[in-house]
Amino acid sequence: MNFPKAIHLKSTGNNIIDWGNIETPIGDQISKVSGYLLDKSSNHEMGYWQCSEGEWDCHVTKNEFCHFVEGECTYTSEDSSVINISPGSIAFFPKDWKGKCKVVKKIKKFYCIF
């Protein structure tokens, strides 16, 4: 009998990969992103993500669940509702959510896209 393999990440440590710059910056400060992909298939993605200070236009193309472990940022939706993020925050962004993200202190999160 074959059992599914559990995914375990003891530490992000040296596994972090540079994923480049945010593609839709607002202003001169361009956020840099990096992370670690835990699992990816055609219908989901799970991983660790971190982002430096800056602001950008944000469009979530699939449902995304996030648990923020460090930093501070604000998500402002197109209808002007605001989500303030701090360590320990959990957020869910539905497919096609649009708005702006402003990172004021480098953020780190674990996420699941589905």
Predicted feature locations:
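Short hydrophobic/aromatic-rich beta-strand segments that constitute the beta-sheet cores
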Residues: 58, 75, 109-112
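Short, conserved beta-strand element in jelly-roll/cupin
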Residues: 51, 60-75
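A short, N-terminal "cap"/entry segment at the start of jelly-roll beta-barrel domains
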Residues: 1-43
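Short acidic-glycine-tyrosine-enriched beta hairpin
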Residues: 79-95
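Conserved hydrophobic/aromatic beta-strand scaffold that supports enzyme active sites
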Residues: 46-48, 65, 90
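Conserved short histidine dyad/triad with adjacent acidic residue
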Residues: 39-60, 94-95
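Ligand-binding loop in jelly-roll beta-barrel domains
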Residues: 89, 95-114
